[in-house]
Amino acid sequence: MRSAKQGLGGVVLLIGSLGLGAGDVMAIEESRYTVVEQVDNFELRRYEPGIVAETLVEGDFSDVGNEGFRRLAGYIFGDNRKQQDIDMTAPVSQESASEKIAMTAPVSQQTAGGKWRITFIMPAGYTMETLPVPLDDRVVLKQEPGRLMAAIRYSGTWGRERYQEKEASLRVFAAEQGLKIVGEPVFARYNAPFTLWFLRRNEVLIPVERVQQP
């Protein structure tokens, strides 16, 4: 096993101005995970519990990120009861939150108008009691449990077609490893829109659990 850092990002479609260039990612705090297994460019990761700020946005995959980011960025940049700034973390994450589709359904089955969950992981050291309360009632704080996640990392564009291609590959990997998919796929972006496409860090993650052998 080896340790690494990363944000779950339950997505994202982003983003107005993260302030992250190609070389800035590692300077930003990320949520913590341990790599349990690695096969080629696939990883099985165990994420530690954490707190996220989340907002639900209704719309198409390619459109919801900007709105979600604006709400969450407003919160961490002082739109809260303490008027307190909170350090930026990475990545921003996005996943389906549609009530019409089972949790194991792929994003490719989502329809326009579905709900998407956009999240920022909160920096280590905060608790639910010490984080400032959001002024925007569309932003809520939630405790995220630790999770086992299958992951694939890639560079390139943020288009839906490429995301679905990587998601499909990750599902094949999970099946080959005897893993049961237990939640929605998550799209994580680590860079600002102005970062050159070939320097971007993108990830698709899927919650999984090991299948008990009879």
Predicted regions and their residues:
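A solvent-exposed interaction/effector surface
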Residues: R2-P214
